[in-house]
Amino acid sequence: MRAFVVTGPCEAGVQDVADPQPRPGQVVVDVARVGVCGTDVEFYKGDMAYLHNGSAQYPLRLGHEWCGTVGSVGEGVDSWWLGRRVTGDTMLGCGHCHRCTSGRQHVCADRYEIGVRHGWPGALAERLPVPVTALHELPDSIDDTAGALIEPGGNALRAALASGAEPGRRVLVWGSGTIGLLAVQFAVAQGADVDVVGHHEETLAMARSFGARRATLSDEGIEGIYDSVIDATNNSSVPADALALVEPGGRVVYIGLASEPSLIDTRLMVLADVTAVGILSASPAMQGVIEYFASGRVDPRPLVAATVPLAETAAILAGRRPSDAGPGPKMLIDPHAG
C-alpha cells in the first residue's frame, strides 16, 4: 500500500510499504480522510519534543485525525465491525495500569499514540491498524469530512466543558485555529456568551458566523473580563495574559502548547481564587463529539479549507495552500487520491 513517510526534517514522501495485517484484538481500517494538524507540522520540521526525548524517531508515519471503514478484523474481534465507518482514539494505553483501568488511558505512561508516539503507524496511508477498543462507530449523518474532525473536536469539547460554558457565562477563546474555532462552536452550543481573539480576519469571520459575540484581531487588544478563558494558542505569553483577563473565582483552560516554556505568576492565581485546567487528548470526549456532530448542533465542515491527495502532503506540511482553498484553518488528505 501507499503511505506518507517522514524520513528526516523536511524530508518526506509517499512510499510503498507492506499492507498491515490485523493482530488479535485489532482491525485494519481503509482510511477515507486524514486531518493535518500542528503536531504533524512539528514532526515534519523536526521541532516536535518527542523527537528529542526518545518518544519518537524517524522514519515516521504521521496522521492521528482520521476516519474510514473497517476492512478486516483480527482474531477475537467481532465480524460485526466489518464494513463499519469508524474513527478512533489516538491514545492507546497499556490497558493494565491504574490510569488505564480508571478511564485515563490518554495519560498512561506506556501509551502508544497513533502517528505520534512509540512508532505506531499513522493514518496518512491507505490502511491503518487499530485496536478495536479504540474505535468509535460513525453514523451516516457524519460524512468523511466531519469524521476526520472528531479527534480535534474531542479536545475542543473538553476545553469548552472545562470552561464551565453555560447560559450567561462569559467565555473568551484565545486562538482561532481549528481547536479554537471548534471550542467556540461547543461553547456557543452550551449557551455561553463567547468572544474570540485571533490573528486572521478570515477565521474571526468564521467565529462570528458560529455565534461569537465579538471576534477581535489580537493586535487590537482585548477589552473586558471573563468568567472563563480558553487558551488555544501556541504562544508562550498567552497563559499569563489569559490569567489577567479572568474574573476572580473564574477558570482558565490551557489546551494550546508553545514550543518553549510559559510562565504564570501563581500568586495572582491564588489571590484571585482562579482554577486552571490543562487539557490533553480527545479521549474522554470523542463519543460526545459524535453526538454533537450527528445532531447538527455543531458542524465542523466549514473549518476545512481543502482536501488534497496523499502526494501533496509534504507541500501542505511545508505551509502551502491550494489556490482554491477556502478560509478555514484545516487541511484534509485523501489517502486514496492521487
Task: Identify the role of each PLM range.
Residues 23, 81-82, 166, 247, ...:
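Residue-level recognition of short, solvent-exposed, well-ordered loop/turn junctions
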Residues 20-34, 49-98, 139-141:
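Glycine-rich beta-strand-centered segment in the early N-terminal region that forms part
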Residues 163, 195, 201, 205-275:
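Glycine-rich cofactor phosphate-binding loops and adjacent beta1-alpha1 units
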Residues 140-219:
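Mid-domain Rossmann-like dinucleotide-binding core that forms the NAD(H)/NADP(H) cofactor-binding site
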Residues 64, 94-174:
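NAD(P)H dinucleotide-binding glycine-rich loop of Rossmann-like/cofactor-binding domains
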Residues 255-259, 279-282, 308:
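Short strand-turn motif at the edge of the Rossmann-like AdoMet-binding core
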Residues 1, 240, 283, 287-338:
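C-terminal hydrophobic helical "lid"/dimerization subdomain
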